[in-house]
From Swiss-Prot:
Coiled coil: none annotated. It is a peripheral membrane protein. It comes from Dechloromonas aromatica (strain RCB). It is found in: Cell inner membrane. PANTHER family: ATP SYNTHASE DELTA CHAIN (PTHR11910). This is ATP synthase subunit delta. The gene is atpH. SUPFAM superfamilies: N-terminal domain of the delta subunit of the F1F0-ATP synthase.
Length: 178
């Protein structure tokens, strides 16, 4: 994993610089994310790793999977990655691109894990409170984990705020056992 991120970094940096020069980081973000999702698809991933599938076939596969959602510049990027046998790095490239984009915008990703599904209005109400706690602008990524029993757990970078019932029970168990 660490090696693939190291190899993916120059591609992601070049892609980010190009997107920044075009002045449309958000549009490129959507397209790069789509490419990463396509590459992470198990069928596509196995095709990428199959030595019997030629580079032009892989490029055609990506172009047909993405359709018109990917513009000509990113289509050329797919061609470049294919020629260098790097299509399998697209999920890492997409992740690094998002990291660079957030750094440019001064935001961080808040991974919000809830015991129960929460709607967009609840997330919108929660974000300003979390921004005050973490002292940074946040973008939310929400997931559900019923094992939390109740409450939420928020992870921003290397910081975690655990306001879940499971977290409280674990803390009590630790206190009682020590």
């Amino acid at each position: 994993m660490a090696e693939s991120v190291t190899i993916a970094r120059p591609y992601a940096e070049a892609l980010f610089r190009t997107a920044k020069e075009s002045g449309n980081l958000a549009k490129w973000s959507e397209q790069v994310s789509l490419l990463g999702q396509v590459a992470a698809n198990p069928d596509v991933s196995s095709a990428i790793g199959d030595p019997n599938v030629a580079a032009p076939q892989l490029v055609d596969l990506f172009r047909s999977a993405c359709g018109t959602a990917v513009d000509a510049e990113l289509s050329n990027f797919i061609q470049l990655l294919s020629n260098n046998d790097r299509l399998g790095l697209l999920p890492e490239i997409a992740g690094l691109y998002e990291t660079y984009k957030r750094a440019e915008e001064g935001t961080k990703q808040a991974d919000i894990v809830s015991a129960f599904p929460i709607d967009d209005n609840q997330v919108k109400a929660l974000i300003p409170q979390l921004e005050a706690v973490f002292k940074t602008k946040l973008e939310a990524a929400v997931s559900v984990d019923p094992t939390l029993i109740g409450g939420i757990k928020v992870i921003v970078g290397d910081q975690m705020l655990d306001a879940s019932v499971r977290g409280k029970l674990d803390a009590m168990a630790t206190a009682l056992n020590n």
